[in-house]
Amino acid sequence: MSRISHITLDDSGLPPPTPEIEQERKVAMFDLLEDNTFVLPPREGRPVPEGPYHVSLAIRDKRLVFDVNTETAEKAAEFHLSLGPFRQVVKDYFQICESYFDAVKKLPPSQIETIDMARRGIHNEGSRVLQERLEGKADIDIDTARRLFTLICVLHFGG
């Protein structure tokens, strides 16, 4: 099974993230590299270079760009996704994360748990949208989708 062995975020020109966003980014990147599934299907009947892959994520011209190379720097794929389908779920995710970060500081565990469940639900929705948008471009499992969605949110935060 193919996977991502290295990931970078092109956040040049974006404002610095908050400490909470930076922590989310670090955790998502670590977890992603520990365990992920990322398979590129053949394109137009031609095979694609096999992984593991180095993936760079960027937002360019209001599009999410996946730049995928092999470990030997051979171009494997590049695809651009419209950010439109992600806008509402990213906005909802940031709002619930803000509530969660505030709750952790001052609310009892039962209320934190309720907010966390809502946060996970929105995160799952964003992951599902990502899997749909990548259909035919890359096959990823739900855990990989969740971690990549977190990184997309980090890029959105600055953009």
Swiss-Prot record:
- Family annotation (Pfam families): UPF0262 (PF06793)
- Coiled-coil intervals: none
Q: Which InterPro entries does the entry mention? A: UCP032146
Regarding protein family, the annotation reads:
Belongs to the UPF0262 family.
* HAMAP family the UniProt entry points to: UPF0262
Write the protein's name.
UPF0262 protein RD1_1069
User: What organism is this sequence from?
Assistant: Roseobacter denitrificans (strain ATCC 33942 / OCh 114) (Erythrobacter sp. (strain OCh 114))
